[in-house]
Design a protein with these regions (language model features):
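Intrinsically disordered, low-complexity terminal tails/loops enriched in metal-binding residues
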Residues: 1-288
């Protein structure tokens, strides 16, 4: 029997590699994908959160920034597209093309207004009673979006000189009261929320007399509006109302769908209209 030379061993090894590679390619082509391979992510993906002034091809351009505290402080900005030109048309998002928020870093100041377009610039004004560190957010839905439920949110920090009385963020609790005397109680369980898990948050609204509201007046084309802000990161989270506009509220309860992308505490601001007035209730929730 002839002994195998070094060359024979090399040719044998090459042949084995060719056979194995061919088998892998054959099975890779012929084996259908499994059910798990076709499945998407098991948890919702995070969305635009206002931590950047540029995202998804859009950029926030400062035109007029708040310079002093006071009432009716002017703000103006442009939204630039990928080509660097101002974008002046967006889809309606709860009846408005542009939502604009301002929060102070202790969550004691919250403003939600709707800028108007002047040429290529969005103009508005906000009440800023105290100095301190703030963040502003521009929220809009591009005309060509493939995900109309999740707007683009661009955020820009700013600060105001002057006396600042920092207010500790309230601990998570079930009940809140508006400045107009309404009580709002969170009734869903458990109290602590899971990160990147969709949840429905339910809020029972009572009049100053303690009577459950039977229905709410339209506010931004819905029963209410809710936005959350991470108390440390100052990121924004958009929550979606569940009950259709005009439907009676069972026991005065209003429901929102929410997904929170980060662990920590969030401050939620619920806005609703009743008896011709806008009411705002704030809640702190914990996410783990």
């Amino acid at each position: 029997v002839r002994k195998l030379t070094f060359v024979d061993w090399v040719f044998a090894l090459v042949a084995v590699v060719i056979v194995v590679a061919g088998s892998v390619m054959m099975f890779g082509r012929s084996t259908p994908p499994t059910q798990h391979q076709n499945m998407g992510p098991v948890v919702p993906a995070s969305h635009s959160d206002g931590l950047s002034e540029a995202e998804s091809g859009y950029r926030f351009e400062r035109v007029v920034m708040p310079a002093n505290r006071g009432t009716g402080v002017p703000v103006a900005f442009r939204i630039l597209g990928a080509d660097g030109k101002p974008v002046t048309r967006f889809l309606d998002n709860q009846t408005k093309q542009m939502h604009f928020f301002v929060v102070r870093d202790d969550m004691h100041v919250f403003r939600h207004v709707h800028p108007v377009l002047d040429g290529d610039t969005w103009d508005t004004s906000v009440d800023l009673p105290d100095g301190g560190a703030y963040r502003m957010f521009a929220e809009f839905i591009p005309l060509d979006t493939k995900d109309p439920l999740h707007p683009v949110v661009l955020g820009v920090p700013f600060s105001l000189a002057g006396d600042t009385e920092l207010v500790p963020v309230p601990q998570p609790e079930a009940q809140s009261r508006t400045g107009t005397g309404y009580s709002v109680t969170r009734v869903d369980e458990p109290a602590t929320l899971g990160v990147m898990s969709e949840r429905k948050l339910r809020f029972a609204i009572r009049t100053p007399d303690g009577v459950p509201v039977e229905g709410l007046e339209p506010h931004l084309g819905a029963n209410g509006h809710m936005t959350g802000f991470h108390t440390m990161l100052l990121s924004a989270t958009h929550l979606h109302p569940v009950e259709p506009l005009g439907a009676p509220l069972i026991n005065g309860e209003l429901t929102f769908r929410a997904v929170f992308a980060d662990r920590g505490e969030y401050r939620l601001f619920l806005e609703f209209s009743h008896h011709g007035r806008l009411h705002t209730a704030a809640f702190t929730v914990a996410v783990e």
